[in-house]
């Protein structure tokens, strides 16, 4: 019901619904709301039998008219640098079909991607997804840790000429039920500081005009009286 409500709201409100890294389920599709397909290290929805990235499966699923953007999840504010595991006991037939994973086995989402491991490989992966999806907007989500690592990504963009369409800056304030409390509360650059860093880096490298910035991670708004 929650996923259906989110997607129905996106449809009614004219905005997009992020799938999260668990893949695209029938519940995401039921109401026809626009989707941002998030792809994490588990590659759910585009996963090979060995657990790696399957380009042909990605091409098939990204062709859906509902999928408007694709987001590569590098890290998240709730648990930056931390992977995840879905115990075998929780892998139901439905989850097996949605995620493309076998029943009876633990499902690992490792801390890092296997499709790339360097900034140059990351931007080349962005290009690969853009080509396979027929030119749909491709970006990545990141919780800033070591500032020099984001600078390295900017340098890779300049060197290759390959730029993401958007970057999602996830503040360290973000949370999730599956995150260890040490990671949730004490790791990751705070949202405002991270936004300033990303804005300044992209501007300094002459990249800002071509890349949209999206802020997430316990982002709230209220009205002052």
Pin down the residues of each PLM region.
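N-terminal capping/small domains of soluble enzymes
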Residues: 1-111, 121
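Glycine-rich phosphate/ribose-binding loops and adjacent secondary-structure elements
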Residues: 110-225
């Amino acid at each position: 019901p929650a996923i259906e409500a989110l997607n129905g709201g996106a449809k009614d409100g004219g905005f997009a619904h992020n799938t999260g890294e668990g893949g695209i389920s029938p519940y995401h599709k039921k109401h026809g709301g626009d989707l941002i397909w998030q792809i994490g290290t588990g590659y759910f929805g585009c996963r090979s039998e060995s657990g790696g990235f399957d380009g042909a499966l990605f091409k098939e699923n990204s062709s859906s008219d509902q999928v408007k953007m694709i987001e590569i999840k590098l890290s998240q504010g709730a648990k930056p640098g931390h992977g995840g595991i879905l115990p075998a006991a929780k892998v139901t037939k439905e989850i097996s079909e949605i995620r493309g994973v076998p029943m009876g086995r633990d499902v690992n989402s490792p801390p890092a991607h296997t499709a790339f491991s360097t900034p140059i490989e990351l931007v080349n992966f962005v290009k690969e997804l853009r080509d396979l999806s027929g030119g749909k907007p491709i970006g990545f989500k990141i919780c800033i840790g070591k500032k020099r690592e984001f600078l390295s990504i900017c340098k890779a963009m300049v060197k290759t000429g390959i730029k993401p369409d958007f970057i999602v800056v996830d503040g360290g304030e973000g949370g999730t039920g599956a995150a260890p409390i040490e990671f949730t509360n004490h790791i990751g650059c705070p949202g405002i500081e991270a936004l300033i860093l990303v804005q300044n880096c992209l501007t300094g490298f002459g990249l800002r005009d071509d890349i949209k910035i999206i802020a997430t991670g316990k982002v709230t708004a209220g009205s002052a009286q």
